[in-house]
């Protein structure tokens, strides 16, 4: 039987909620299970680890960084806009921005989903559409909350993969495919540090990667949903874990 303690250690940024009046940090099972099924060992990262001295001690122990989706949104002041964000999670923002920049500097693999993609965009100098529904040229990218969860995560629209990038290398036989869509915000301006990897039919950025980094991929859809049942989703997670294994090998050579 495989010893899971030999698997790449993946740090997963948590989300803050309130449970029975208590501040609580949580992770949804679907994100954790997708990492386990792909051969990784997920480790929860509470927001207090944003403290620089703690983060400096933590990063050498991690083989990959995983930024999951969340009901919360990135605070607008982080990308140069005014106004409040009612669905904010400042602790997550603080940890995510710090850990993205540190991971990029150390060339640690990153896989970012939904809010995670938006964090990757903001951390590298880009900005977001705060309300996609107010952009008349864009499709409806939100889910219908009245539907059962299985239907909310059903395929919603196609994405077109850009040639020559990380996503096309992972999916060489698949230049377009259908994805689910459960987000109210999205990438507005993408930094020159990022490569656009895929777009939806309305032109909205659906995937990005960091240029000159071995594996730093963000996707706007949710491949973690029943990831073991869908070949395309499995390939993304397995590609991430493979990159983490390569990072381990690089660390051992130093």
From Swiss-Prot:
The disruption phenotype is:
Cells lose the hydrolase activity.
Q: Which NCBIfam families match?
A: PRK11366.1
- Catalysed transformations (reactions): 4-(gamma-L-glutamylamino)butanoate + H2O = 4-aminobutanoate + L-glutamate
- E.C. number, please? 3.5.1.94
The record, for CDD domains, names: GATase1_2
Record's keyword annotation contains Ligase = no
Q: Which GO terms describe its molecular function?
A: gamma-glutamyl-gamma-aminobutyrate hydrolase activity
Organism equals: Escherichia coli (strain K12)
Alphabetically sorted, this entry's keywords are: Hydrolase
Q: Which domain of life is it from?
A: Bacteria
Task: State the protein's purpose.
Answer: Involved in the breakdown of putrescine via hydrolysis of the gamma-glutamyl linkage of gamma-glutamyl-gamma-aminobutyrate.
Q: Give me the segments passing through the membrane.
A: none
Protein name, per record: Gamma-glutamyl-gamma-aminobutyrate hydrolase PuuD
Active site residues of this protein:
114 (nucleophile), 222, 224
Q: Name one Pfam family in it.
A: Peptidase_C26
Question: One GO biological process from the UniProt record?
Answer: polyamine catabolic process
Presence of keyword Protein transport: no
Give the similarity note: Belongs to the peptidase C26 family.
Q: Which lineage ranks, top first, belong to the organism behind this chain?
A: Bacteria, Pseudomonadati, Pseudomonadota, Gammaproteobacteria, Enterobacterales
């Amino acid at each position: 039987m495989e010893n899971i303690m030999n698997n790449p250690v993946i740090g997963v940024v948590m989300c803050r909620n309130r449970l029975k009046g208590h501040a609580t940090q949580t992770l949804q099972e679907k994100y954790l299970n997708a990492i386990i099924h792909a051969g990784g060992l997920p480790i929860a990262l509470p927001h207090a680890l944003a403290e620089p001295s703690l983060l400096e001690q933590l990063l050498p122990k991690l083989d990959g960084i995983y930024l999951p989706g969340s009901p919360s949104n990135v605070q607008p002041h982080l990308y140069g806009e005014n106004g409040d964000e009612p669905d904010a999670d400042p602790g997550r923002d603080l940890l995510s921005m710090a850990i993205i920049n540190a991971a990029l500097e150390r060339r640690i693999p990153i896989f970012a989903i939904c809010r995670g993609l938006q964090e990757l965009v903001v951390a590298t100098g880009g900005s977001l559409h705060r309300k996609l529904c107010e952009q008349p040229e864009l499709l409806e990218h939100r889910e219908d909350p009245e539907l059962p969860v299985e239907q909310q995560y059903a395929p919603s629209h196609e994405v077109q993969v850009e040639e020559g990038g990380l996503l096309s290398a992972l999916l060489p036989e698949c230049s377009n495919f259908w994805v689910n869509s459960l987000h109210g915000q999205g990438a507005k301006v993408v930094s020159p540090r990022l490569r656009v990897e895929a777009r939806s039919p309305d032109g909205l950025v659906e995937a990005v990667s960091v240029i000159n980094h071995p594996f730093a991929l963000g996707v706007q859809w949710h491949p973690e949903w029943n990831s073991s049942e869908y070949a395309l989703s499995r390939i993304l997670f397995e590609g991430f874990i493979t990159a983490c294994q390569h990072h381990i090998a690089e660390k051992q050579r130093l």
